[in-house]
């Protein structure tokens, strides 16, 4: 299970308050419905869910990793959130939402297009009339960025770590290593890049109309790291 040992160090590795605010701002700009209901998939440590809850939205925050959910539940601002462990490729919550979010390139953790298709189908069943799905995913530029090995090293609470990232074909491989109490803890993550047209075709087949931005607010054809896909019923 990924995000097990890593959950303890996740925020120290990737927390970006400015980016969290930009994700929340984008969500508000798209929804334009204060106080509406939102389901977040792959919420991680729930930074974005907590920020949206502070802005008055009703959040259910879900993730496959219960270790990450436990990390999220302990945060200030998490008191008003509902949490649930959930596999985003297939779920049935017996309720619907005004919006579903899947941020931080979480969709790139899915193993293939069939899993993505299954996710979109599950999302469609959980959206209210005129509901919205918003997610981001890697662009081809992101693959190119790690065509040469990237290594980050440092200390988190006196625990040495190393994070290695490298592109292999259409995948980005992450290797995390932590040296704690004389032991090395490791996690290996694989993210897969998907063709944007394939993704849009599957969304259209589910009845969504789509808009694509790059890096929050640029045109679809602009260079950048992330596609932001806005899919509306």
Which ranges hold each PLM region?
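Conserved class I S-adenosyl-L-methionine
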Residues: 1-44
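Class I SAM-dependent methyltransferase SAM/SAH-binding core
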Residues: 46-90
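A short acidic, Gly/Pro-enriched loop at the edge of an enzyme's catalytic core
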Residues: 89-99
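A short SAM/SAH-binding and catalytic strip from SAM-dependent methyltransferases
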Residues: 98-114
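A short glycine-rich, Lys/Arg-flanked "PGG" loop and its adjoining helix->strand segment in the class I
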Residues: 117-129
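SAM-dependent methyltransferase
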Residues: 134-202
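C-terminal lobe and adjacent flexible extensions of AdoMet/dcAdoMet transferase-like proteins
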Residues: 198-233
């Amino acid at each position: 299970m990924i995000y097990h040992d890593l959950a303890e160090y996740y925020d120290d590795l990737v927390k970006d308050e400015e980016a969290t605010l930009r994700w929340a701002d984008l969500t508000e700009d798209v929804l334009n419905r204060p106080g509406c209901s939102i389901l977040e998939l792959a919420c991680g440590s729930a930074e974005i869910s907590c920020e949206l809850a502070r802005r008055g939205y009703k959040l259910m925050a879900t993730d496959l990793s219960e270790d990450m959910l436990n990390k999220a539940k302990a945060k200030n601002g998490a008191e008003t959130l509902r949490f649930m462990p959930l596999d985003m490729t297939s779920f049935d919550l017996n309720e619907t939402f005004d919006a579903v979010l899947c941020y931080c390139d979480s969709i790139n953790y899915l193993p293939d297009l069939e899993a993505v298709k299954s996710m979109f189908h599950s999302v469609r069943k959980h959206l209210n009339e005129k509901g919205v799905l918003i997610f981001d995913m890697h662009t081809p530029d992101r693959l190119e960025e790690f065509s040469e090995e990237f290594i980050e090293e440092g200390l988190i609470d006196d625990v040495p770590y190393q994070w290695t990232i490298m592109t292999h074909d259409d995948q980005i491989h992450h290797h995390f290593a932590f040296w704690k109490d004389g032991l090395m803890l490791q996690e290996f993550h694989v993210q897969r890049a998907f063709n944007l047209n394939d993704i849009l075709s599957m969304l259209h087949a589910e009845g969504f109309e789509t808009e694509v931005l790059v890096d929050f607010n640029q045109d679809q054809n602009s260079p950048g790291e992330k596609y932001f896909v806005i899919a509306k019923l």
